Amino acid sequence: MGGICIKILNMSTEGLTPEEIIEIRKILNQHIKNARKKARHKECLLCGKARGFCDSHTIPKFCLENIAWNGKLNSFNTLIDSKILNNDSGISNAGIFHIICKPCDGSVFQDYEKAEAYETYPTEKALNQIALKNALRDIYKHETEIEMFEASKQIMKEKNRILSLFVNPMFNAQIRAKKRDVQECYDIYNISKSFLTTSESWIRVVSYDKLDYTCPIAFQGMVPLVTGVDGEVINDNFNHKHDYKIEYLHIAIFPLKEATAVIMFIDSSSTRYAQFEKHIADMTQKQRLEIINRIIFLYTEDYYLSKHLDEDTIRILQEPAKLLQDPVTTDPKRSLRNAVKDYDLRRDICLPNLFSKEYSVKTDD
């Protein structure tokens, strides 16, 4: 959960007793539970029927099973080393959301949620289903975040009315930004849903790599790249004009049995990724995977890691995780300059490349 939760997870628990930490956990969990309840839809977003929601995995469950150890995975919280939330995750609750029903979850995504889909090049149908699942998951995520910010405003108002006058602009800015995110996710949802029953495509593949070993990371999502390989601006995330649309890069990292599929694709109508696409195409596989590795750890928090990774590797990965934030600003030009610097894919940052064979894990037959 971005925004509020990142700030909470970065909050120092030094000096707190175990009992106080437990109490904070209870309050936060109730806060999240209430937000999810308020954001809850009445009907399945895919079929429109009111028959309850299932635990829908963003990343295919079989991929998570390939890197789990005793059914457990490391998550973003592991790198934050949070004392407030659990540092590991079970396969059953890793990256789940509740916005579609079980029949839809079991039928709509069949083409991409099976290992056979990646024995060769993934089909257009599979890629479209990945995009649809990404949009659904982010709609759920951002709508919940909006309710969390609304609840935080109310809590602040009740606790300290004077202070709330100063922090309300920050909350309101976050809410506006999240509402824009939701609308853009719905745009992707509508496009991908409309292509479910056709062989045509709206997708352009940026890269597809099939490795002959299992990488210790699983990820599926869409990223609004701020800057490309040359430092060029791709998305101005601080431009809130109604006619400005964020262009997303979809990424899937699927650990298979003794293999890994790594996919990047975009909307074929996107124009701002042209330079990035050219650079990616000109790179060696090693260079390309290094860039993808950096994108994951500089931009996202929704990846899952094998618990077989050693402590030194986890420790090194903690630094970019702790820097991940959801900034709010009143100076868009300055913020864009800072963002281009912060997300520079060329900058000197020591990150273990989890796509390297040295980090590969063995999967059970």
Residue ranges and their predicted role:
Residues K7, K26, K33, K37-K38, ...:
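Context-gated lysine
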Residues G2-Y121:
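An N-terminal structural lobe/cap that precedes and organizes the functional/catalytic core
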Residues G2-G3, P18, A126-I130, N160, ...:
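Low-complexity, intrinsically disordered regions enriched in charged/polar residues
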